[in-house]
Amino acid sequence: MAACHWIGAKGWAPATGGNMSLREDARWCWLSESGKDKGSLTTDDFLQVEIATNLAPSGRKPSAETGLHTLIYRLFPEANCVLHVHTVNATVLSRVEKSDALHLSGYEMQKSLAGQITHLDDVPVAIFDNDQDIDALAERIARHHRQFPLRYGFLLRGHGLTCWGSDVAVARRHLEGLEFLFECEMQRRLLERA
């Protein structure tokens, strides 16, 4: 719950936006319920969801992006936490960047991402066009991943950031690191225009 409350306090899940999940095992995950304020979530606000089917046995409504969480758990067996946020930086950068990835390079904080050991690497963060058809969106993401493996997270154009990690701490570090890098990139672009 602490990570959810931290996200809420940062304003990264405004107006009940965003969602979070934890893997229980190979079959199940726990996903935040739709329409809940992420800054005040309790354990009762998480629904058990079957990873293969996206179904919640309770009958309650899981997040609209359930299919993206379960996709990540299927693509990355080592992923045990998924965080989806609607930050200003992620939302705006994903709209102004016209290519299919936001390329980050030269930032020391790239090393906050698992496996990154230098600021000299190019770190591409894939950008997918937003789609209300989550099944179709998940299929596009899966196809992209087969050709260009995803790492850490991806952006949905005009929507936000989805990231993951081997546990809550790693997912949170990826979220915080990427958000910092996005803020740096926003500032860099603004200053270059001035």
UniProtKB/Swiss-Prot annotation:
Q: What is its EC number?
A: 4.2.1.109
Residue ranges that the Swiss-Prot or TrEMBL entry lists as coiled coil: none
Q: What class does this enzyme belong to in the EC scheme? A: lyase
What reactions does this protein catalyze? 5-(methylsulfanyl)-D-ribulose 1-phosphate = 5-methylsulfanyl-2,3-dioxopentyl phosphate + H2O
Query: Which keywords does the record carry?
Result: Amino-acid biosynthesis, Lyase, Metal-binding, Methionine biosynthesis, Zinc
State a single Pfam family of this protein: Aldolase_II
Record pathway: Amino-acid biosynthesis; L-methionine biosynthesis via salvage pathway; L-methionine from S-methyl-5-thio-alpha-D-ribose 1-phosphate: step 2/6
Q: Which cofactor does it need?
A: Zn(2+)
Cofactor binding mode and count = Binds 1 zinc ion per subunit.
InterPro entries, sorted? Aldolase_class_II_sugar_metab (IPR050197), Aldolase_II/adducin_N (IPR001303), Aldolase_II/adducin_N_sf (IPR036409), MethylthioRu-1-P_deHdtase_MtnB (IPR017714)
Its biological purpose: Catalyzes the dehydration of methylthioribulose-1-phosphate (MTRu-1-P) into 2,3-diketo-5-methylthiopentyl-1-phosphate (DK-MTP-1-P).
From the Swiss-Prot or TrEMBL record, give the protein name. Methylthioribulose-1-phosphate dehydratase
Gene designation per UniProt: mtnB
